[in-house]
Amino acid sequence: PGSCTVYMARRSLLFSPADRPELMRKGPDSGADIIASDLEDAVAPAHKATAREGLVTLLSDPDFDPDCEVCVRVNSDPDVAEMDLKALLGAEKPVRLDSIMLPKAETAADIDQLVTAISEYNTERPILAICESAAGVLHAQEIAAHDAVDCLLFGAEDLSADIGAKRTES
């Protein structure tokens, strides 16, 4: 009696640029626990609309049903993220989208803003928040404590740039 929730381990994450949906289609073959299509840094501004269209085509394909978590990294700019969400969650056909990644999360208010935007489509998705700035690191505990946040990630490259650190090879 009762119910049991089974959680998949998140040991590995494979990113692919959203303007290359064929790479995401191959992602499950990598054995990664999460495959994430990146609409933010990996796609030039001039290609974002086309990237969204191709991504929605892939994620609404009934033949695309991998045995791993399917995530999309939306844009950090709220206006551009809204266009991402409209394409994904407002699509004519249902899309395979298990979670949404929020880059450059700096406070719990950033999470609130994304949750509100997602709720406009009468749905919920777990949020994978990326702390990529000094402010994000300072507020990591409040970000991680947000009910909608399922996972907290650390973005070393953008953090290094934010604090003016010089990356060195080891």
Label each residue range with its predicted role.
Residues 6-170:
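Conserved alpha/beta-domain cores
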